[in-house]
Amino acid sequence: MTLAKNQKSSLSRLYKKVSSKRSESSRNLEDESRTSSNSSGSSSLNVNELRTVFDYMDANSDGKISGEELQSCVSLLGGALSSREVEEVVKTSDVDGDGFIDFEEFLKLMEGEDGSDEERRKELKEAFGMYVMEGEEFITAASLRRTLSRLGESCTVDACKVMIRGFDQNDDGVLSFDEFVLMMR
């Protein structure tokens, strides 16, 4: 696994972990603000969630993530970054050259503006391929059930149809790669 991939996946896991630990009251406040806001509401909700993750990582609350703070958070997730790797992560993410990752730099990193969009798309293509039956170009309820079964999850075809329906934008009963990408966001 490359350093960029390791960095991105560790930060993504941290993002999910911290986001899932938000209190119910925070969720209710966000739901209310999302309901009352315009179309940019979903975007600002994402920024709010990223702010929560950033604040969690910024242990000393100085508005910046240091190499030590980054290393500590990755360690909490069961990952490991050497001092050299941490230095490289900070160096590649640190646009203003102050030796830290500020919130704007963190946003760019998490939104894929660090040049890793192609890598992310390639990873998603590989994951998509796991769910697709040979010779097909989409995920069907049967192929989803088969893959989930191989992963130890039992699920009926009808339940898989319901899962697919949630992300099937053109109502054709299957998931295309683009629909899969939306689902994985």
Swiss-Prot record:
Function, as annotated: Potential calcium sensor that binds calcium in vitro.
Record flagged with keyword Metal-binding: yes
Gene Ontology molecular function: calcium ion binding
Organism of derivation: Arabidopsis thaliana
Amino acids binding Ca(2+) 2: D94, D96, D98, E105
Residues annotated as binding Ca(2+) 1: D58, N60, D62, K64, E69
Biased composition (Polar residues): 1-12
GO annotation, biological process: cellular response to hypoxia; response to ozone
Induction cue: By touch, salt and hydrogen peroxide treatments, drought stress, wounding, dark and infection by the bacterial pathogen P.syringae.
Biased composition (Basic and acidic residues): 21-34
Protein keywords: Calcium, Metal-binding, Repeat
Residues that coordinate or bind Ca(2+) 3: D168, N170, D172, E179
Quaternary context: Binds to ABCG36.
Region feature Disordered, mapped onto this chain: 1-45
InterPro entries linked: Centrin_CML-like, EF-hand-dom_pair, EF_Hand_1_Ca_BS, EF_hand_dom
Cellular-component GO terms for this entry: cytoplasm; nucleus
Domain EF-hand: 45-80, 81-116, 119-154, 155-185
Protein name as it appears in the record: Calcium-binding protein CML37
Tissue specificity comment: Expressed in cotyledons, stipule, young leaves and at the hypocotyl-root junction. In mature root, expressed in the stele, cortex, emerging lateral root, root tip and root cap. In mature plant, expressed at the base of cauline and floral branches, and in rosette and cauline leaves. Expressed from stage 9 to 14 of flower development in anthers. At stage 15, expressed in carpel, sepals, petals and pollen until dehiscence. Expressed in developing seeds and young siliques.
Pfam families, sorted: EF-hand_7, EF-hand_8
Gene3D superfamilies: EF-hand
Ranges annotated as biased composition (Low complexity): 35-44
CDD domains the UniProt entry points to: EFh
